[in-house]
From Swiss-Prot:
Tissue: Expressed by the venom gland.
Protein name as annotated: Omega-ctenitoxin-Pn3a
PROSITE patterns, A to Z: OMEGA_AGA_II_III (PS60023)
Organism in which the protein naturally occurs: Phoneutria nigriventer
Domain characteristics, as noted in the entry: The presence of a 'disulfide through disulfide knot' structurally defines this protein as a knottin.
Disulfide partners: 41-58, 48-64, 55-90, 57-78, 66-76, 96-102, 106-111
Cited InterPro entries: Omega-agatoxin_II/III_CS (IPR005853), Toxin_34 (IPR013605)
Biotechnology: Could be used as a diagnostic tool for the autoimmune disease Lambert-Eaton myasthenic syndrome.
Protein localization: Secreted
Histidine amide: residues carrying this PTM: 115
């Protein structure tokens, strides 16, 4: 009796296990396979590839920032540069092929005096 009950439990739970394991289950002719859509750029806060350039990050002043542990880049994410670095990052992104609008930061005393 125990073996019969075990067989029924396994038979009922098998589709659930396959679903959680990520194995696609085809159900007839109209089964749809969902694929990952490739994005042209990565949003701020999302993971990026530390081996690629900063063009992978969407915003004009965003760059791929990584933690370095024992010489290896890990936990790379797209981050926004500081006021001091944003303009340089934006200017470097002109090579990415996207239209970038870079506004020079107001850092000097003279600039701050004139622009509030």
């Amino acid at each position: 009796m125990k073996m019969k009950l075990l067989g029924i439990i396994l038979l009922v739970s098998f589709p659930f296990v396959l679903g959680f394991a990520g194995i696609p289950i085809e159900e007839g002719e109209n089964s749809v396979e969902v694929g990952e859509v490739e994005r042209s750029c990565i949003n701020v806060g999302d993971f990026c590839d530390g081996k690629k350039d900063d063009c992978q990050c969407c915003r004009d002043n965003a760059f791929c920032s990584c933690s370095v542990i024992f010489g290896y880049k890990t936990n790379c994410r797209c981050e926004v540069g500081t006021t001091a670095t944003s303009y340089g990052i934006c200017m470097a992104k002109h090579k990415c092929g996207r239209q970038t609008t870079c506004t020079k930061p107001c850092l000097s005393k003279r600039c701050k005096k004139n622009h509030g």
